[in-house]
Amino acid sequence: MKVNGDVLKYGDNIDTDVIIPARYLNTSVPEELAKHCMEDLDVDFLKKLKTGDIVVGGRNFGCGSSREHAPICIKAAGVSCVIAKSFARIFYRNSINIGFPILECEEAVNDASTGDKLEVDFIEGIIKNVTLNKEYKAQPFPDFMLKIMKNEGLTNCVKKGLF
């Protein structure tokens, strides 16, 4: 499981209210949520984003309200993964449950800048900043989490009888 994309970098404490503002929670349709992804933080986010790009954040990414809409929104917008120094635990678990890969790697975040090109190998836990020609080691996902992501979420795994 590998992805590559350009970095869109943000800071610490990116909460679920700026990932998907509460005023748009009248729907659970991923494509509708995606239209408003990060708009309260960066009004040009969707203009900057190319499918497959990687969001890089600081500490406590996904803090705030416990809403599954936040990782659904980011995934539906076309972001391939999020790399952060740390994640709010409920955001982390919600992301895995919907099959959206996220990694914690403080060194990679410290060195990355918006526009850098990254390659991410989730099986090995390797993040390569192609722009800087640097490689970082994150904690790879255990097999059961890889299974969830490969099958686009926990619900699909259960439907297929994998768990």
Swiss-Prot record:
Pfam families linked: Aconitase_C
Pathway where it operates: Amino-acid biosynthesis; L-leucine biosynthesis; L-leucine from 3-methyl-2-oxobutanoate: step 2/4
GO biological process entries: L-leucine biosynthetic process
Assigned keywords, A-Z: Amino-acid biosynthesis, Branched-chain amino acid biosynthesis, Leucine biosynthesis, Lyase
InterPro entries for the chain: Aconitase/3IPM_dehydase_swvl, AconitaseA/IPMdHydase_ssu_swvl, IPMI_Swivel, LeuD, LeuD/DmdB_bac, LeuD_type2/HacB/DmdB
Catalysed transformations (reactions): (2R,3S)-3-isopropylmalate = (2S)-2-isopropylmalate
Disulfide cysteine pairs (residue numbers): none
Its EC number(s): 4.2.1.33
SUPFAM superfamilies given in the database record: LeuD/IlvD-like
NCBIfam families cross-referenced by the UniProt entry: leud, LEUD_arch
UniProt function note: Catalyzes the isomerization between 2-isopropylmalate and 3-isopropylmalate, via the formation of 2-isopropylmaleate.
UniProt-listed PANTHER family: 3-ISOPROPYLMALATE DEHYDRATASE SMALL SUBUNIT 1 (PTHR43345:SF2), 3-ISOPROPYLMALATE DEHYDRATASE SMALL SUBUNIT 2-RELATED-RELATED (PTHR43345)
Protein's name in the database: 3-isopropylmalate dehydratase small subunit
Gene from which this protein is expressed: leuD
